[in-house]
From Swiss-Prot:
Cofactors, names only: Mg(2+)
Native species: Psychrobacter arcticus (strain DSM 17307 / VKM B-2377 / 273-4)
Domain ACT, residue spans: 732-817, 840-915
Catalytic activity line of the entry: [protein-PII]-L-tyrosine + UTP = [protein-PII]-uridylyl-L-tyrosine + diphosphate; [protein-PII]-uridylyl-L-tyrosine + H2O = [protein-PII]-L-tyrosine + UMP + H(+)
Family: Belongs to the GlnD family.
InterPro entries: ACT-like_dom_sf, ACT_dom, HD/PDEase_dom, HD_domain, NT_sf, PII_UdlTrfase/GS_AdlTrfase, Polymerase_NTP_transf_dom, UTase/UR
Task performed by this protein: Modifies, by uridylylation and deuridylylation, the PII regulatory proteins (GlnB and homologs), in response to the nitrogen status of the cell that GlnD senses through the glutamine level. Under low glutamine levels, catalyzes the conversion of the PII proteins and UTP to PII-UMP and PPi, while under higher glutamine levels, GlnD hydrolyzes PII-UMP to PII and UMP (deuridylylation). Thus, controls uridylylation state and activity of the PII proteins, and plays an important role in the regulation of nitrogen assimilation and metabolism.
Region feature Uridylyl-removing, mapped onto this chain: 361-731
Positions of region (Uridylyltransferase): 1-360
Protein's UniProt name: Bifunctional uridylyltransferase/uridylyl-removing enzyme
Domain of life: Bacteria
The keyword Repeat is assigned to this record: yes
Example GO biological process: regulation of nitrogen utilization
GO MF term set: [protein-PII] uridylyltransferase activity; phosphoric diester hydrolase activity
Length: 915
């Protein structure tokens, strides 16, 4: 039984209900509820007051461990009192606390798991009393998770490993003391150590997959996610089954757990309990998911104050960094300790043929089955270089894992990596050799990171461990993102992934010094969180590291250049018009040579894939490939390649004609095709690819009277097709109609009304004032691709809107929950394009429902003509570009630009304030 220490924590005494007042006969709720209500008056309010007392005690600095134990004791006393009230203590029943409550751990709104155990079948009278007890518990607001079982029923139920886990935590509160050890005996009878270990490990693996197998989710579940409380519980479950202990600290006395490991687990558990307390307090329920809704407030409650020089998100980012570090420590210890249990308890009991065989690698290391192990316990102390040598051997021998006694020694040895260690030429050679060895590189670096080797060898890497940017775009911490990037680089030499990355894979396989890219990956984000330009700061740090490790100036400078310009290619491809030869030429000038281009292309594709799983798609892949190919032609001075505007137009027309000749084109006359193309204008062939040109051409020519004689009375043409290569629910929409001033605004309003997100937009005006608008959309409802009625509705809505071009009607939708917690300042900039006499307007603002419809409405009000748009959504940020002019295709005046900017900011600000 726990010591509640009520006086020390100053909890409010229980009102009226006490065992001293229970001398009268127990009352049935169904016969005399008035006396019961009088006796139990105030208990719901008392329970709320207890929660308030606990919260105030936490504010005063009382240890959270005391508080979760104190609340468990309070509930103990209440349940014991009620058990007596209903005279259940005069039966053969035993009342057990199980699960977390059995461990004596209750947060404000934790589940109260209880078991009523009977040696035989429960009679009707006892069953009635139990029903009354349960009803009362619900009436006073406890909402218990109650199981009522006989011993035989419990035996059968324990075949479910989740119930067996709860029984392992069973703690007798009151009742039949002869049943005190029965729950544990049942588990021991029903489960062998090996079977129970296997099922709990399988459960943990399944649980990890539900949370993307990472500790670094943006809104982590602090109970069930990797690195959550469940990872501590699993250590207790598998070990308690064997050692028959009740507390985690008992494992220290069993020499299974070291004092330091216990302290680390205990501290991390307390940190999560504190977060959990505030989650329960803020939500008023058993909430374990650390949503954006609560992260800022919990950071403040836990003392993460914003400093005068801080960025707006600094405090919450510090809080989440500490959470992620805590989660990584828990998951690492949990994995190590469960493996240690297998190696020391399960493995020795296996038949000889199933036990891993030991084979010497050298004087310092052995291979034990599929693991590496030090040959004796003094290896790291006597041979410090063996820390890095071990990881190199793992790559050379194809060994993925490390024995736990070696991991324990490694963790201690890693603390001794200091500047003298880093300056040792032998150690430097071994570290670079590790990066050159591609076999299991990700897994080796991951182990280095988790056990302190990487952070001590590269101190700057330790600074970004657990560092998360508070946004929806960056899905992982900097260290996790960096290691994922290196993992993706390795996939470029894996035949299984060649189909996903054909061009990148072929380029990467031709690069001889692959460690150049690995080093660039290691350093590309290493200066985040310091303030200033992280790319430039990282360049300096990477060059210093490479030179200190004996690399040539050329190699060091290439690593530095890649670190500095790692965002250049993705930003150019996504934010600029790469159909413009001047844009590509400027990019080529910055890149300088094909070697730089090849390395940058590979690094950029890997970086985008490792940043956010939703970021990479065939649309972005096409943009990147297009920019790479065009730049490579310029850098190679390919005289046959189109390098100027007219050459690119001619090349696209030629490619489209070749495709036309290779398909069934009986519905298209070649002369009519060429005549139509002459009407479409040069801009069209600069911006569209040959495949889409062929699709558009066939649609136009087979839609009379547009195809043969376009005129002002021609009906609008709207055609759709799926674009699954881009995304599962992607739809391509092509519009060909008489140009009009509000076409963009009307189109965006219709898309918004039908819950369609715009990924890309190309707005082109043909020579005869016909608009050729092409859009790539994402269907939020997922029905447009499969529902012909929805397709027809979209077509008809657009056609009706084009025929009746009144001011578009905007919808008012609630902003998604996650977006509400981000403050993105709206910024608008203009750049004049001499070649087109148009302004390029860049808009950065909070992504929100109906954003483009609102922008289109402002364009309509300000009499702005849209010629092209590039739509980019990066998490919570919308970063869009529009090529605009006045309605006479003339450049906008300075006053007009100022008015437009003011109108846009005002429109978007009003909308943001209202949702």
């Amino acid at each position: 039984m726990f010591n509640c220490a009520v006086t020390a924590i100053d909890l409010t005494p229980m009102p009226l209900l006490s065992t001293d007042n229970m001398t009268t006969a127990p009352l049935s709720l169904s016969t005399d509820t008035s006396l019961i209500e009088k006796s139990l008056f105030g208990i719901p309010e008392w329970l709320l007051q207890i929660n308030d007392d606990i919260s105030r005690a936490l504010e005063r600095g009382v240890n959270i461990r005391q508080l979760v134990s104190a609340r468990a004791c309070v509930i103990d006393d209440l349940l014991i009192g009620l058990f007596k009230w209903f005279e259940l203590d005069k039966t053969d029943l035993a009342l057990f606390a199980t699960g977390g409550y059995g461990r004596g751990e209750l947060s404000l709104h934790s589940d109260i798991d209880i078991l009523l155990l009977m040696p035989h079948e429960i009679d009707a009278d006892t069953s009635s009393k139990i029903d009354n007890l349960v009803a009362l518990l619900w009436d006073i607001g406890l909402e218990p998770a109650l199981s009522v079982r006989s011993v035989s029923e419990c035996l059968e139920a324990a075949l479910d490993h989740t119930i067996a886990s709860a029984l392992l935590e069973a703690r007798l509160l009151i009742g039949n003391e002869t049943l005190q050890d029965v729950p544990h005996q049942i588990v021991n009878n029903q489960w062998s150590p090996r079977a129970f270990y296997d099922v709990k490990i399988d459960e943990a693996k399944a649980r990890y997959l539900q949370h993307n197998a990472t500790e670094y989710n943006l809104e982590p579940n602090i109970k069930t996610a990797p690195g959550g409380l469940r990872d501590i519980h699993i250590v207790g479950w598998v070990t308690k089954r064997y050692f028959r202990v009740s507390k985690l600290y008992d494992l220290v006395q069993q020499n299974f757990l070291t004092e330091k490991e216990f302290d680390e687990l205990s501290f991390s558990e307390g940190y999560l309990w504190q977060i959990r307390h505030y989650l329960h307090e803020l939500t008023g329920r058993n909430e374990n998911k650390l949503l954006f809704d609560y992260q800022r407030e919990i950071a403040q409650l836990m003392g993460y104050d914003t400093q005068p020089d801080d960025q707006p998100n600094a405090a919450v980012e510090r809080f989440m960094r500490d959470y992620y570090r805590c989660a990584m420590q828990i998951s690492t210890l949990s994995e190590m300790l469960t493996n240690h249990y297998y190696e020391t308890i399960i493995e020795p009991q296996l038949p000889d043929e199933e036990r891993p065989k030991k084979q010497p690698i050298n004087a310092r290391f052995n291979q034990v089955g599929e693991q590496i192990a030090m040959a004796h316990h003094r290896v790291f102390a006597q041979h410090p270089e063996s820390i890095l040598e071990m990881f190199l051997l793992m790559g050379q021998y194809g060994i993925k894992n490390v024995r736990t006694h070696t991991l324990r020694a490694l963790k201690i040895a890693a603390r001794g990596i200091d500047q003298a260690y880093r300056d040792n030429p032998t150690h430097q050679t071994l570290f670079l050799a590790n990066l050159k060895e591609q076999n299991y590189l990700f897994h080796r670096l991951r182990t280095m990171n988790r056990y302190g080797v990487l952070g001590n060898y590269i101190p700057a890497f330790a600074q970004v461990t657990g560092l998360m940017q508070y946004d929806l775009f960056h899905r992982y911490t900097v260290d996790a993102h960096t290691l994922f990037l290196i993992r993706i680089l390795h996939r470029f030499i894996d035949p299984h992934f060649y189909e996903d990355f054909p061009l990148v894979s072929s380029i990467f396989q031709r690069i001889e010094r692959k460690e150049i890219l690995v080093l660039a990956a290691m350093f590309h984000d290493i200066a985040k969180g310091r303030g200033g330009n992280h790319s430039q700061l990282g360049e300096i740090e990477s060059i210093e590291f490479c030179l200190a490790h004996g690399m040539s100036n050329a190699d060091a400078n290439l690593v530095g250049w890649l670190t500095r310009y790692h965002l250049l290619m993705s930003m150019t491809a996504q934010k600029k018009d790469i159909s413009d030869p001047e844009v590509v030429t400027l990019f080529a000038d910055l890149v300088g040579n094909v070697t730089h281009l090849n390395h940058l292309y590979v690094l950029t594709v890997a970086d985008m894939n490792a940043t956010n799983p939703q970021l990479w798609n065939s649309w972005r892949a096409t943009l990147m490939k297009q920019l790479y190919s065009q730049t490579r032609r310029i850098l190679r001075a390919d005289i046959d390649a189109p390098t100027n505007r007219q050459d690119m137009i001619s090349a696209t027309r030629k490619q489209a004609l070749m495709m036309l000749d290779n398909v069934d084109n009986q519905h298209m006359n070649r002369d009519e095709v060429l005549s139509l193309w002459d009407d479409l204008g040069d801009e069209y062939f600069l911006r569209e690819i040959a495949e889409d040109i062929l699709w558009h051409t066939e649609a136009i020519l087979n839609h009379p009277p547009i195809g043969r004689a376009s005129n002002a009375d021609s009906p609008p043409l709207v055609v759709l097709r799926e674009h699954r290569e881009l995304a599962l629910d992607a739809v391509q929409v092509f519009v060909y109609t008489q140009d009009q001033v509000n076409l963009f605004a009307v189109t965006m309003a219709v898309f918004d009304q039908m819950n369609l997100d715009v990924l890309d937009a190309r707005i082109i005006t043909a020579t005869r004032d016909f608009a050729l608008d092409s859009y790539v959309l994402l269907d939020r409802s997922g029905t447009l691709l499969v529902d012909s009625d929805s397709q027809q509705e979209l077509k008809q809505r657009l056609i009706d809107a084009f025929k009746n071009p009144t001011a578009p009607k905007l919808t008012h939708k609630r902003i998604p929950r996650q977006l509400k917690h981000f403050d993105v300042e709206t910024t608008i900039n203009f750049e004049f394009n001499d070649a087109s006499s148009q302004h390029i307007m860049s808009l950065e603002t909070l992504d929100q429902p109906g954003l483009l419809a609102r922008v289109g409405q402002v364009f309509l009000q300000q009499q702005i003509e849209v010629h092209a748009a590039r739509i980019t959504t990066l998490g919570e940020r919308a970063e869009d570009m529009f090529y605009i002019s006045d309605q006479n295709d003339q450049a906008l005046s300075a006053n007009k630009l100022k008015t437009l900017k003011t109108a846009l900011i005002e429109s978007l600000s009003v909308h943001n304030d209202s949702i």
